[in-house]
Structure formats: structure tokens, C-alpha cells
Amino acid sequence: EVLSDGETVPEKSGVKKFLITGGCGFFGANLSARLLERGHPVVLFDNMSRKGAEPNLAWLRGLGKPEVRTGDIRDAAAVADLVRETRPDAVFHLAGQVAMTTSVKSPVDDFMINAAGTVNLLEALRQHRPEASLVYSSTNKVYGPLEGVKLVEKERRYTSPSHPHGVREDQPLDFRTPYGCSKGAADQYVLEYARTYGLRTAVFRHSTIYGCHQHATFDQGWVGWFCRQALEQKAKPGAPAFTISGDGKQVRD
């Protein structure tokens, strides 16, 4: 059963306690919902700054009793208190600055959230909960523009004869844009804390995630944004046209 706020989880009970940073965002909310449905105690850590966080939290509270901690990943003391007080068995680190365009406008904020914020969490785990597992949500941007991969333009899409099923995760890293650099730095710190300090960490390099509860915008979550724009065009003849960058043949995994 789902444990109420404040109850402790027996270390060997088999019921795992999960901490999700960015827990009220698109990815975090969907993951939290699945864990709550399976009876796990879940702690959500979010600064509630992004559009959609409040309705996502309301949805989650209709599914169970998540423990909610409002705070900022940039606040090292708050993150340390979070880990020390909640003692999670596993952490999904999903909090972050998610738009490349925002990183270009505000590179310092982007770095402090994505890179420094991740180190704050790693240090908190190292000091207070080294046995916990950490899964980090990275990005395909760490691979850069893939300049060495030849692309062939077809009628409806681009293809890569040398990589028909996409590039492998051992593709050399090539950080580009402030966003790629901040996420790439965090990506490598997560792996290095496993090598240097023995933390249990893993990195997922996601690309073009979309789905329910996303609240997509033009510069982040573009599949959802395109779908919404297309529906609005259909529902409102004469609505302003929307812009597709490039030729529309780009392919993501």
C-alpha cells in the first residue's frame, strides 16, 4: 500500500522509496503516476516554475499521496536536507532547464540549473545516501550535430545509410550550444561519481519525448506543440499559420 507522508519505509521491506526531482514536470509526473499506482512511496521535488506543474501535481494527488517538497536544485543546502530527511532508495533526476533557446539567452542560469544543480544532488547522495541508485535524464544533444554521419535526403525524410537504426550510444560526444554543454557536463559528472565514489548511477540520453501532461511549447516538446497547432488550425479556419523550422524532413529516434 502507499505509505502516508512522514512514514518510514523498512530497509528490507521490498517497498522502494523514490525521489523524483522535477517531479511535477511532464516526464516526472508520468513516472510518479506509474510508481504511485504500483504502491511505492514517492517524494516530489520541484520549484513549480514551469507551466503545467500545478495541474500535474493536482493530477498526481488524485492518484495517491506523494510527498511534495518545494525547492530549487540550485540550492545545495536544500538538496542536502532533502536527501538526508527523505532517505530515498532510488532517485530520478529530472529537474533541469530544458530548452536550447533559453540556454542561449541565459547561459549562466542554464549552467547553474543543469550542471551545478546535478553536482548538488550527487554530493547530497555521496554524503547522506550513498547506497541509493540515481538515474539521470540527459539528452541527445551531447552528441552534437553528428557531422561525421552522412545523411541522404529522401522524399519524406532524411536517412543515414551507415546508421539505419540510429547512432549508437558509443558515438563520440560533441557538446554544442550552452544547453548541450550544461547537460553534457552533468551527464559526465553522473558517470564520474560512479567511477570515483562508487555511487550507483546511470544516464539515459533521451530524444524527442512526447505524451500526456507535457504542456509543450514551441522550443521544447515540439511534437506535442505541432500537434496542438495542427488541431487549432483545423478547429479554427483562418487561424494564424505556424512556422516549421527547416524542411520538415528531420528525423528523431
Predicted regions and their residues:
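Glycine/proline-rich active-site loop of Rossmann-fold NAD(P)-dependent oxidoreductases
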Residues: G148, G184, Y197, I209-W225, ...
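C-terminal substrate-binding subdomain of Rossmann-fold SDR/epimerase-dehydratase oxidoreductases
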Residues: V2-D5, G22, E37, G71, ...
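N-terminal Rossmann-like NAD(P)+-binding domain of SDR-like oxidoreductases, especially those catalyzing
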Residues: V2-I209, Q214
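A short, amphipathic alpha-helix embedded in the catalytic core of nucleotide-handling enzymes
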Residues: Y193, F226-Q229
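Intrinsic disorder/low-complexity segments enriched in polar/charged and small flexible residues
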Residues: R61, G224-C227
